[in-house]
């Protein structure tokens, strides 16, 4: 009887999972929340065995072939699993999709069959109607009264020739998800503006300008927080806001959430006091009305 009950509770869907370097380092909370959401949805994540760095900016700015080869190795591992490949990191997603485009466009690239691997960003995974319905049914702590703006950044939807996005300039996936959680989505025009993540170390001055524009636009829209699904964007937006606040005490300060963090918090049975500890900007005041 116990075995039968266990069998009924076992996840019925399995997907390959490529966390990438950031989610094993500075964005561990993103990784943890993706795994929490997968459990809520009865999805088993099978982390790729012996995966490697996608190369991100350092590889494709150095050597095209190196960038393709690094991504290709991960695609080969995924191809052996014969499962869809779920990718949370926007940069990793971009590099895997760019490698697949190279296989299609460049006959000399040795990537037979790798362009057919289904590479799915978490935002596309969670926007499916059936997935949104399951999340809606699992919400225990709705974000009623909370005003948020979705921030997609540069890499999840653009360029569409690489990502395959049908709405590269005005994506809707996170908008739908935020509403399912009970929050209000505020209209704004900075959804896909660059935050300067790749310049955050060599040109912090430019990055601060870009971040300031984004945060001020969110504040003007009436938002109490920004929601993203890119580890570089999240770290950059929060850390540079602290710099800006030191320069100008009147500069707005908005917490930046991973969308999966909010899903995990809203569907959790109990309040986890340490959930927001990794954040540089404390979201406690914003989330307290929802009991989070």
Predicted region positions:
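Iron-sulfur cluster-binding electron-transfer modules in prokaryotic oxidoreductases
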Residues: 2-292
């Amino acid at each position: 009887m116990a075995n039968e009950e266990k069998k009924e509770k076992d996840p019925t869907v399995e997907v390959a999972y490529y966390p990438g370097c950031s989610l094993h380092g500075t964005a561990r909370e993103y990784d943890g929340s993706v795994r929490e959401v997968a459990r809520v949805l009865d999805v088993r994540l099978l982390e790729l065995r012996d995966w490697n760095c996608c190369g991100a900016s350092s590889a494709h700015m150095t050597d095209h072939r190196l960038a393709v080869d690094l991504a290709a190795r991960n695609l080969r591992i995924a191809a052996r699993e014969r499962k869809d490949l779920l990718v949370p990191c926007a940069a990793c997603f971009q590099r895997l999709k760019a490698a697949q485009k190279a296989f299609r466009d460049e006959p000399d690239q040795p990537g037979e069959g790798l362009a057919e691997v289904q590479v799915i960003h978490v935002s596309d995974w969670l926007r499916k109607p059936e997935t949104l319905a399951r999340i809606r049914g699992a919400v225990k702590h709705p974000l009623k009264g909370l005003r948020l703006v979705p921030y997609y950044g540069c890499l999840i939807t653009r360029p569409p020739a690489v990502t395959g996005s049908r709405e590269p300039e005005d994506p809707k996936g996170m908008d739908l998800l935020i509403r399912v959680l009970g929050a209000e989505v505020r209209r704004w025009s900075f959804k896909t503006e660059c935050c300067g993540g790749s310049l955050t170390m060599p040109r912090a001055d430019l990055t601060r300008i870009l971040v300031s524009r984004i945060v001020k636009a969110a504040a003007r829209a009436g938002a109490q927080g920004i929601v993203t699904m890119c580890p570089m964007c999240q770290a950059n937006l929060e850390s540079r806001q602290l710099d800006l606040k030191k320069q100008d005490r009147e500069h707005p300060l908005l917490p930046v959430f991973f969308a999966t963090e909010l899903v995990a918090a809203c569907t959790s049975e109990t309040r986890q006091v340490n959930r927001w500890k990794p954040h540089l900007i404390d979201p406690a005041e914003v989330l307290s009305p929802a009991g989070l």
